[in-house]
């Protein structure tokens, strides 16, 4: 969604993912150079591979060292870098932090790993530039209001938008 909007604005985005448990996670690599897919789904990991299929003109890179991936993305012509699951990654400067909140389990049992699903405590939400409520079409108005109240506690003026999943 964000990459598509950037493309419409004339930007050249690239997506950088860790590629967790993929064949390329440790050494890193280019899944797609924005022209063709260069590795298998097993090497890329499921999500990066699906992103490369869905966004054929957008470079997709994976690897634990996201600084290396970022440099490769810029070398491929990217002028905007989108980090998949990058909120808690501090190795790169950023202009915006967009946090996705799943309306079906919005706050990961309110605890960080291993007790809950959060990568950081909820107080980290104060750094967010934008909240996107995913699957908001499946949540009731009352559920969305509860989520927004929690988000307002941490990001008082941070914009909150709803999104819906579609095939």
Feature-to-residue mapping (PLM):
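Phosphate/Mg2+-binding loops and adjacent switch elements
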Residues: 11, 20-155, 162
């Amino acid at each position: 969604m964000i990459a598509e909007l950037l493309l419409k604005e004339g930007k050249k985005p690239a997506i950088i993912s860790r590629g967790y448990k993929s064949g390329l996670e440790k050494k890193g690599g280019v899944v797609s150079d924005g022209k063709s897919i260069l590795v298998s789904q097993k090497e890329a990991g499921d999500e990066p591979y699906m992103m490369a299929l869905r966004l054929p003109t957008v470079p997709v890179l994976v690897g634990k060292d996201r600084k290396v991936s970022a440099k490769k993305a810029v070398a491929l012509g990217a002028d905007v870098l989108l980090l998949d699951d990058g909120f808690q990654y501090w190795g790169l400067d950023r202009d915006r932090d967009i946090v996705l909140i799943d309306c079906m389990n919005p706050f990961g049992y309110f605890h960080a790993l291993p007790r809950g699903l959060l990568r950081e405590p909820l107080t980290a939400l104060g750094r967010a530039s934008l909240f996107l409520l995913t699957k908001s079409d499946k949540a009731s108005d009352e559920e969305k209001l509860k989520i927004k109240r929690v988000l307002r506690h941490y990001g008082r003026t941070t914009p909150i938008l709803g999104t819906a999943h579609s095939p």
